[in-house]
Amino acid sequence: MEKQKPFTLFVPPRLSSSQVSAVKPQTAGGDSNYFKTVNKCTEGDFGVPLTMSSLSKNRENIDTDPAFQKLSILPMLEQVANSGSCHYQEGVNDSDFENSEPMSRLYSKLYKEAEKIKKWKVSIESELKQKENKLQENRKIIEAQRKAIQELQFENEKVSLKLEEEIQENKDLIKENNATRHWCNLLKETCARSAEKTSKYEYEREETRQVYVDLNNNIEKMILAFEELRVQAENARLEMHFKLKEDHEKIQHLEEEYQKEVNNKENQVSLLLIQSTEKENKMKDLTFLLEESRDKANQLEEKTKLQDENLKELNEKKDHLTSELEDIKMSMQRSMSTQKTLEEDLQIATKTIYQLTEEKEAQMEELNKAKTTHSLVVTELKATTCTLEELLRTEQQRLENNEDQLKLITMELQKKSSELEEMTKFKNNKEVELEELKTILAEDQKLLDEKKQVEKLAEELQGKEQELTFLLQTREKEIHDLEVQVTVTKTSEEHYLKQVEEMKTELEKEKLKNIELTANSDMLLLENKKLVQEASDMVLELKKHQEDIINCKKQEERMLKQIETLEEKEMNLRDELESVRKEFIQQGDEVKCKLDKSEENARSIEYEVLKKEKQMKILENKCNNLKKQIENKSKNIEELHQENKALKKKSSAENKQLNAYEIKVNKLELELASTKQKFEEMINNYQKEIEIKKISEEKLLGEVEKAKATVDEAVKLQKEIDLRCQHKIAEMVALMEKHKHQYDKIVEERDSELGLYKNREQEQSSAKVALETELSNIRNELVSLKKQLEVEKEEKEKLKMEQENTAILTDKKDKKIQASLLESPEATSWKFDSKTTPSQNISRLSSSMDSGKSKDNRDSLRASAKSILSTTVTKEYTVKTPTKKSIYQRENKYLPTGGSNKKRKTVFEFDVNSDSSETTDLLSLVSEEDISNRIYNNNTPDSHLLVKTPKQTPLSLSTPASFTKFGSLKKMREDRWATIAKIDRKRRLKEAEKLFT
């Protein structure tokens, strides 16, 4: 794109109604300087809120303007008319009557133009008042928005206080839940009797599975929707890119067309200049012909004098001959006698006479013809001299008018230079005020900044459009004035044509600017549409998140209902416990161990449930924040829509005005053609009048020489005025370039804001991805918890079966087996698990024997030992604690599988028959190789019996190592997602830069 040429803005001043009497047509220099001063007024006022002081200053400048103080030009015109009439007072009175008619027309036109100027002044004052009202309304709106922002901040503080209170309430609820869980642990003592209710848990498990399947399906749908949105965004970006290219090509095409038009206009101007030079050459030729015709006329007069003398001589000869003829006749009468002798002489004489008479008649005819030709030549010469005299008179009048106008222009230039200095000072003050306002506006919040920037754009567009309308009006007036002046002065035609071309080029530039402004408004509309689409997408995503949250809440409500039912069951079971306590006193020590382990399981499950509840609350808070942000954005988008609609309406109205102005320009061109025709008719009339004005030829020749001297002086003055005008134009161009730099800065700020918006959108997308990863982790944890529940249920069923088997075995066994058990207690080595050592089992049995148990307990132990000895090797029984193999497998879910047994790993080994609940008896860390050697005695595990004690519940422990590894995995995933989000941001920023470059 080539840089646009600097141009000057012409804006008409505001008139006071009391000063207008008539409008005087001015020269090009005066008009241009006048409108430049007014242009500075408008540039100083642009972009700053108008006040009454500025209006008063403008009005004082208008009142002191010399252009309007000297509008009453009627006496001047009368003087010109009187001076013109004194040159041809000796002529006919009809010419005075014909000159009075165009003067009356001129007066009527001048009064019409004065009325138009009054109307224009009233409309400008009303527009200024409207602008002041709009500025006051905008200030009120800004203050209201500030108050609303303060209220929102107070509300946010209140909400934060409420959140803290709710957090404290949640802590209290957690304490209450811990207390209730202690009661729930008592229920686990009677889990054997509550086996019938496991079917309900299985049914609920299936429901939860279905819920999780639905959640997975929803997540997959979300992923597909996000991919579709990404594809749509890329398609929209490509469409925008293509549209921008098309608009760029159109603009280039329009520039080429306008350049062609400019070249055509320049060619026309050159042709007009050539025509004017040709006319001047014709004038010179005519003057030369006049002088030649005068010389010829003098020569012809001398010839006519000579011919008159010849005619007189011939007439005398003729008279002499006639007298001789009479004498001869008398002599013939006297001398009849001598007739015969003289007949021959007479015949000869008659012949000679006839010949002489014929020759004389031919000479007379030739003389008559020469007289007629000379008379025609004389009449033609008289006509040409008359036309030339009239032309000289008109030129003298024009020269006098030009001298008067030059004097007026010099006075106006001096006054306007002083006004220009005042306007520059005023403009500087306004620029300082603008900077102060900008610093104040920068302190507002980001949302207000965005809104104000859009409003500034709208105001700038309005201001530019108003300037364009003012410029169009002023240029139409200038074109009209120039057209009138073309009819008055042929010598200034070149200057006026140049000004007309400059005005047309400036109009074309302003049209291009209008097109660019419309393109910018279209771009803003497209960006607003994109924002609306993104907001709608965000709303849909929020709805989906809300549905997920509602489902989670429903699940929580179900769990709470289950807890309530369990509490009711607790109350019922307490009554039963009092009756059953007597029976279970013997088995109390064993049950305590089971209860401790089950409590630990329950606590771990509760801890995980609390974590999930906290995560759900965090997600709810995030969703609420997103909702608020989307509501704010939707409000901003609606406001932008309304502003864009208003801008569209204004642009359409201004386009209509431009079309109307173009129609007016066409009409003015037609009027120019008609005025040219009238001018030609006037020339013909003047040529007729020249025939009457032969007397003033000699006077005009002297006056022409004086006029030439005055013309030379006027040309010098015009050159000086042009130089001054060029200096002032350069100053105006510098001011316009300053404004252009300011506009470029504003555009850069808009681009940076667009980048910030895009960064925000990318951050939101990365936050969404992080939330999805957290959801997937929570689901995995829930799946692991479900598996633990299933394992516990299976172990409960096994305990039931073992209880039934023990009851049957006690009835069948004899007292002999009991005696054998008493004799050899140490010989029987029980193996409670495939991974418990014999030494441990012996120590546990000895401790149980020495602890002062009741006889029933001993009998049951002996019976169980007898049954083990009598039964085959294939019988298996459940143990109180979970096997080391199962614990090892659970840990291996979170750890990578090793290839060899030589790697040393720590495994938990449980004390089965511990009577006390001390920490030393519960856990002991043992290496994997030592355990395998102790359990199998360096043999295969197939050679050993798998013995399980009755009424044992499994314990699901999650080691601290597994928790730390799970946390490290989470961090790794978050880091990966962060790097992916950064890469996406960089890629989108590059694409945005490509779009805007």
Swiss-Prot record:
GO-annotated cellular components: autosome; central element; chromosome; chromosome, centromeric region; condensed nuclear chromosome; male germ cell nucleus; synaptonemal complex; transverse filament
Keyword Glycoprotein: no
Biased composition (Polar residues): 835-851
Record's keyword annotation contains DNA-binding: yes
Gene Ontology molecular-function annotations: double-stranded DNA binding
Modification Phosphothreonine occurs at: 940
Region named Required for pH-induced assembly of C-terminal ends into antiparallel tetramers: 698-792
A Gene Ontology biological process term: meiotic DNA repair synthesis
Entry comment describing in which tissues the protein is expressed: Testis.
Positions of the UniProt region annotated as Interaction with SYCE3: 207-363
Keywords: Cell cycle, Cell division, Centromere, Chromosome, Coiled coil, DNA-binding, Meiosis, Nucleus, Phosphoprotein
Ranges of biased composition (kind: Basic and acidic residues): 852-861
Annotated coiled-coil segments of the chain: 121-176, 212-696, 768-806
Region feature DNA-binding, mapped onto this chain: 805-997
Region described as Disordered: 828-863
Motif interval(s): Nuclear localization signal: 118-121, 701-704, 902-905
Phosphoserine PTM sites in chain numbering: 824
Motif (Mediates head to head self-assembly of N-terminal ends): 102-112
Compartment annotation: Nucleus; Chromosome; Chromosome, Centromere
SUBUNIT field: Structural component of synaptonemal complexes. Homotetramer that consists of an N-terminal four-helical bundle that bifurcates into two elongated C-terminal dimeric coiled coils. This tetrameric building block potentially self-assembles into a supramolecular zipper-like lattice to mediate meiotic chromosome synapsis. Self-assembly is likely initiated by local proton density at chromosome axis, which is predicted to trigger antiparallel back to back assembly of adjacent C-terminal ends into tetrameric structures that anchor to chromosomal DNA.
Record text about domains: The molecule is in a coiled coil structure that is formed by 4 polypeptide chains. The N-terminal region exhibits a prominent seven-residues periodicity.
UniProt-recorded name of the protein: Synaptonemal complex protein 1
Organism in which the protein naturally occurs: Rattus norvegicus
Source taxonomy: Eukaryota, Metazoa, Chordata, Craniata, Vertebrata
